[in-house]
Amino acid sequence: MDNRLLEILVCPLCKGKLEYDRAAQELICHADKLAYPIRDGIPVMLADEARQSVPGRAVNPDGPASGN
């Protein structure tokens, strides 16, 4: 991900800073605990496409935590 793009992108909900997770290909908003996917190199900045993100584990917004 281009660092210049990362500097201007913000969470669409809280307008907070995002962190790039290279391994998961996601942009993480720690304030809202959301992970926005990056598909084919393009960040998908739609709240409906984000998944809940909790440090240390992923949480499915429609079901139980994964990894349990």
Curated annotation (Swiss-Prot):
InterPro entries tied to this protein: Trm112-like
Pfam name, any one: Trm112p
Gene Ontology cellular component annotations, sorted alphabetically: cytosol
Similarity-based family: Belongs to the UPF0434 family.
Name by which UniProt lists this protein: UPF0434 protein H16_A0605
Organism for this UniProt entry: Cupriavidus necator (strain ATCC 17699 / DSM 428 / KCTC 22496 / NCIMB 10442 / H16 / Stanier 337) (Ralstonia eutropha)
